[in-house]
Curated annotation (Swiss-Prot):
Annotated residues for binding of Ni(2+) 2: K217, H246, H272
Cofactor, free-text remark: Binds 2 nickel ions per subunit.
Coiled coil residues, start to end: none
Subcellular location as annotated: Cytoplasm
Lineage of the species this protein comes from: Bacteria, Pseudomonadati, Pseudomonadota, Betaproteobacteria, Burkholderiales
The record's account of how the chain is modified after translation: Carboxylation allows a single lysine to coordinate two nickel ions.
Main location: cytoplasm
EC number: 3.5.1.5
Gene responsible for this protein: ureC
HAMAP family the record matches: Urease_alpha
Name recorded for this polypeptide: Urease subunit alpha
Cellular component GO terms, alphabetical: cytoplasm
Pathways involved: Nitrogen metabolism; urea degradation; CO(2) and NH(3) from urea (urease route): step 1/1
InterPro entries referenced in this protein's UniProt entry, alphabetically: Amidohydro-rel, Metal-dep_hydrolase_composite, Metal_Hydrolase, Urease_alpha_N_dom, Urease_alpha_subunit, Urease_AS, Urease_asu, Urease_asu_c
Amino acid sequence: MAKISRQAYAEMFGPTTGDRLRLADTGLIIEIEKDFTIYGEEVKFGGGKVIRDGMGQSQRMASDCVDTVITNALIVDHWGIVKADIGLKGGRIAAIGKAGNPDIQPGVTIVVGPGTEVIAGEGMIVTAGGIDSHIHFICPQQIEEALMSGVTTMIGGGTGPATGTFATTVTPGPWYMERMLQAADAYPMNIGLLGKGNASQQGPLLEQVEAGAIGLKLHEDWGTTPAAIDTCLSVADATDTQVAIHTDTLNEAGFVEATIAAFKGRTIHTYHTEGAGGGHAPDIIKVCGEANVLPSSTNPTRPYTVNTLDEHLDMLMVCHHLDPSIAEDIAFAESRIRRETIAAEDILHDLGAFSMISSDSQAMGRVGEVIIRTWQTAHKMALQRGKLPGDPNDARGGHDNFRVKRYVAKYTINPALTHGIAHEVGSVEVGKWADLVLWRPAFFGVKPSLILKGGMIAAAAMGDPNASIPTPQPVHYRPMFASAGGALHRSSLTFVSQAALAAGIGERYGLAKTLSAVRGTRTVSKRDMVHNDWQPHVTVDPETYQVVADGQLLTCEPATELPMAQRYFLF
């Protein structure tokens, strides 16, 4: 029998079962767990290759074939790290398995035909599009920045560069909700809006949900009192929508215990749960141990570095409309920035107590760095803490598959579950919207090669349009055809509440995008956070700010150097 070396095989068809590769310039190594393709029957497109008429391409009608096949891709997702062909049809993931022509090939689960386009996935990593669940919609240019980084869904609120939006992720009231949903039609991004949750009567909250909000945001700048928390969660329970909260840094209306009591065991998404982004000082971090709390971080504190503390003060003053000439404003800002809790946040992410990472875009966060900073945190923890249980440390140096699954879940499946959109997005699974990102391994997490929205390429790193081939410089990110015209409306989703969809807001507002209702937000709990469901008992020393979780002191050194940084951004 003819044989081929592993190296030659990997160069031709991509790595296979047992092969290992490094993610970007991090210390993270992954190993392929399974290969769904069949040796000797692999399909590949090109001159003299397999996907040709009567060979790997069948004669079947389009109804029996996929619209797109991504060949020999390496899928990295919360459920596995596997090699497979991926079939897309009707804007969704139709199959993960073996592509080809079933008339002449065995084991084919993805039929390729004359109506099939090919994307070469050999040597490429495929992930689900990222979900950023903490967006201040301050400027529409954020959307392009996020898309080009590999984010395909943005959840948050705002109305543009208004003072309220600088500080809070809120689209307040039915009028603004309608206008912002109309604006969402213009962008190749899945978008869900949060209304203002700060009210002590249910009426003003219900009308925002009925106008299209997928959830409500409680923010201390609007007054996050126990009464407002209770009212907001009552509306959420009645409408199957999520609540996100930025708690009371100054402890004016009560301490963290009062806030937890106001939750009454009901599900809630706690933003920047460490506290530098805002929340009960100094111990908001302890809520990550509650069964009903779904905790996330924002990316300025990801990971803890020698520069983290210095940059936060100025960010805070600007974002929260504070005056540096007022001593109380300075004290407010300084109370939120604690090296001890930021260091503990790194470890709580690594142990799976913090479940999500988001941006806090232009409001103490960088919209294009959710994915980068997630993997920088994973690298730092691997370097400082070694292998996680479940990741082997063998003669070959071991791999980090479990750690990688834990961290990829933080910006894909877990925010999807939290906000009731996991039936549509959040993972590379059959039936889901085909929001996929392709990466060269050396650029993983930093610079994607292709971004697909609803099964069509929406953005790509593309060379000079006047060149004779696609690759000559200048190569930079450019919008592609899924970002244009009517294709944009069919390749991206706008998420709304069930009440709004039933009320026919699509027709009433004149919306062109496909609308999808959120669901299941009130039954999700910490135990549902994939690979990130630890519920430790956390205490914070009020004088030293030292954090202890289940009796273990959580502390680590700040990073002085990180991967995925200047090496990739020289120009």
